[in-house]
Amino acid sequence: MLTSEQQTHKPKQSKIRYTEYYDLQSTFDRLYADSLKGKTFHNLIGLMASEENIKLAYRTIKGNKGSGTPGVDKRTIKHLASMEEEKFVRLIQKQFSWYNPRPVRRVEIPKPNGKTRPLGIPTIVDRIVQQCILQVLEPICEAKFHERSNGFRPNRSTEHAIAQCCRLMQIQHLHYAVDLDVHGFFDNVNHGKLIRQMWELGIRDKKLLCIIKQMLKAPIVLPDGKRVYPTKGTPQGGILSPLLSNIVLNELDWWVSSQWENMPTHYEYKTRQNARGTDIKSHTYRALRRSNLKEMYLVRYADDFKIFCRSYKDAVKTFEATKKWLKDRLGLDISPEKSKVINMEQRYSEFLGFKMKLYRKGKKYVVCSHMSDKAVTHAKEKISAAIKAIQTPADSHSQYIAIQQYNSVVAGLHNYYRLATRVSEDFPNLAQGLKKQMSNRLRGLTRNGKLERGFIKERYGKSKQLRFLNGHPLIPIGYVQTRDAQHKKKTVNRYTPEGRAEIHKNLGVNTDTMIWLMRTPVLDKSIEFADNRISLFAAQYGRCAITGTELMPYDIGCHHKVPLENGGTDKYSNLVLVTEAVHLLIHATLEETIQKYLKQLQLNKKQLEKLNKLRKLAGTPAIA
């Protein structure tokens, strides 16, 4: 089975790229390596409150979809973007000196089953503080987390969890699943237990642990304005919540692992590694099977997990033992109506929107998987809503936007659920159920139309189900092919140079100059300006946008295409990096000055055209 990282093309991983911008990658690598060796960490606040870490947190939060969502103070990332860089850094550093979190705004988000999920939205400043903490804690925790914990972790996804399930079912012949649903997990996390678990992971900075305690106990403002003061639970919606939930359940991962796969043996058996870097412990497992131990493997994605067993008897004992362990160790209860032992030769077991079963094929069993019933209902509702939006547009442009949104919904569902082996049955059935609605609501659907080059032509161009509306293509709901779920290559790791080489192309710029840029702020300029200046340096490969010469310290001008006094902004699209000589020439109006810099720069025709475009935007006449 191929792994998702076995590609010749290595894309730029945005989070790794941001870390490189602020020269923190080697620091995070060192934290990971030290944690792997079992070292403890007593002074993390200094790193969290460093200028580089704060700027990295700003950049990361700025790129999040939720950055425009206000907290109780009604402020968003836009309010911080206009602050001077130095003032912004001092503001965040002040939080670490004496932290007092603001109340969290409660928002109810509808769930597919008709119920709502409570989200806690911290203020934008508290989100920046949480991001500063997350950036430092993540490499420490990554070194301690289990290989089959897949949720909210770098370079891991639901695809890896499904691949692990399929392997355990089909290759390792574990046909019994223990399905345990933790009742209200995020609302019932014990704060004291969580702090002790962090201490056990080596996070022993007492000031940091006090800050996290205060975050957990931050008042919650309900939609009706009332305040509640939580004594347990981690608010969903916080930046740190996913990491904290993984810390809580990490103990479960290793407890299940200790019952079988990591059980010590008297004799030290040899292990080898396959092409993906996974340990092959067949000799050890053969010896363990001669004992009275129960064979079990856990696959987890956030608070959703399954334990796979070889026999019904083992599965029942594992169910009871895990239920008791969760209650005694973590203070968590399970939902009796949702928790059960399943023989997957006879019944489906649901996980992450899929339902999986084993069926006999010749002398062996193979995995058969579909979209779960809930997933089908949810998909139908999403597509139906997208169809209705196309039917009643305000104008032709609005209809085009609605069609794009419809295509985005359908393609997104295809991408996620194509891991199901029988997805080519599920989506045609879904299409059939929506056929009447489409024909009634979307009058004018036709087979005739022209596909431009791109994603839709590449993936759906051969489909006879493809339809057009006013010349715009609509992705066919029923046209989808299954794809094997691919394992994560074990060597892939954001916090080792070798692991990053598998997935990420390094910055092709002079890092010394980039560090100089980072550490030499422009006075009286906003944090947005400073952040975008560094992004531009990487995007332009460290070269002048006009002459192509290498940009060097003290010879870099960050030019506003449309001047601020003419309504320009500090946004990325309005900035360009040039040498100081070019920058002066863009704004020069005296003939003597213009001739001086033209002589110095010796621009060719193409370079002069680029320069004149910038002069025109700046309100200065073109140079003949």
Per-region residue spans from a language model:
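Histidine-centered nuclease catalytic patch
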Residues: 181, 548-580, 588-594
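Right-hand nucleic-acid polymerase module
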Residues: 1-2, 377-449
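Extended C-terminal regions of large enzymes
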Residues: 430-434, 440-524, 602
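Non-catalytic, polymerase-adjacent accessory regions of viral genome-replication enzymes
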Residues: 1-86
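Short cysteine-rich loop/turn motifs with clustered Cys
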Residues: 527-557, 579-581
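A conserved non-catalytic segment of reverse transcriptases
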Residues: 217, 223-226, 330-395, 410-411
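Polybasic, low-complexity binding patches
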Residues: 565-573, 585-624
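Conserved polymerase palm-domain catalytic core
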Residues: 88, 96, 103, 144-148, ...
